[in-house]
Swiss-Prot record:
Belongs to the class I-like SAM-binding methyltransferase superfamily. TrmB family. The keyword S-adenosyl-L-methionine applies. The lineage of its organism: Bacteria, Pseudomonadati, Pseudomonadota, Gammaproteobacteria, Enterobacterales. Signal peptide: none annotated. It comes from the Bacteria. NCBIfam families: tRNA (guanosine(46)-N7)-methyltransferase TrmB (TIGR00091). Residues 150-155 are annotated as: Interaction with RNA. It catalyses: guanosine(46) in tRNA + S-adenosyl-L-methionine = N(7)-methylguanosine(46) in tRNA + S-adenosyl-L-homocysteine. This is tRNA (guanine-N(7)-)-methyltransferase. GO terms for cellular component: tRNA methyltransferase complex. GO terms for molecular function: tRNA (guanine(46)-N7)-methyltransferase activity. Its EC number is 2.1.1.33. Pathway: tRNA modification; N(7)-methylguanine-tRNA biosynthesis.
């Protein structure tokens, strides 16, 4: 389970320079269930990319705190979180259409109505569609670590991207990351700690225990059985 959604090379204004993406477009074959979900539930829960900023109150039909998840994979944990918090709104971005189809099918089956999904490049969505100071939470769980040194530049968590996320969070909003790759966790911590405007919510100024709000995935359970660690980082926008 590797969810990877943007190209982290930017100019001084935070705009993408070259389309070196942190994901590989492995669309794969849609199952009949995924195809059915895309055909039938996308018109209700799907959001097309637009050059114009989105109005969340219009999109969800109400005013409520908005959580954005970048790279939701097959959507199991995103649907679980949305179902557990009906008083909040959730927007998920995933570039792989089978995952989007699976998420739509699961949301429909669970009767989740406070979830919208996109199938697009996340950095473009952040730049073009997400208003500044609008998000209560941004979630990035298990992005591709690109562990080979020559691929490190493909990692989604870089200073310009973290600064972009900061601009989209409300004051008091939180950027929550999780990874099972220790070197990437250290990289995330270094990047986030270098940015003025974020406060690490860890009492030890590094990692936080997994919050109850983040479901344990099957991928994570398998990792625990194999002795793999998982690192959660939570940074609040304080200025």
């Amino acid at each position: 389970m590797k969810n990877d959604v943007i190209s982290p090379e930017f100019d001084e204004n935070g705009r993408p320079l070259r389309r070196i993406r942190s994901f590989v477009r492995r669309q794969g074959r849609l199952t009949k269930g995924q195809e059915h979900a895309l055909e039938n539930y996308w018109p209700v829960m799907g959001v097309e990319f637009s050059e114009a900023p989105v109005d969340f109150a219009t999109l969800f039909g109400r005013e409520a705190p908005v959580t954005l998840e970048i790279g939701f994979g097959m959507g199991a944990s995103l649907v679980a979180m949305a179902k557990a918090r009906p008083e909040q709104n959730f927007l998920g971005i995933e570039v792989h259409s089978p995952g989007v189809g699976a998420c739509l099918a699961s949301a429909h089956e669970e009767g989740v109505e406070n979830l919208r999904v996109m199938c697009h490049d996340a950095v473009e969505v952040l730049h073009k569609m997400i208003p500044d100071n609008s998000l209560s939470m941004v979630q990035l769980f298990f992005p591709d670590p690109w562990h080979k040194a020559r691929h490190n530049k493909r990692r989604i968590v870089q200073v310009p991207f973290a600064e972009l996320v900061l601009s989209k969070l409300k004051l008091g909003g939180v950027f929550h990351m999780a990874t099972d790759w220790e070197a990437y966790a250290e990289h995330m911590l270094e990047v986030m700690s270098s940015i003025d405007g974020y406060k690490n919510l860890s009492e030890s100024n590094d990692y936080v225990p997994r919050p109850q709000s983040r479901p344990v995935t099957k991928f994570e359970q398998r990792g625990h059985r194999l002795g793999h660690g998982v690192w959660d980082l939570m940074f609040e926008r304080v200025k």
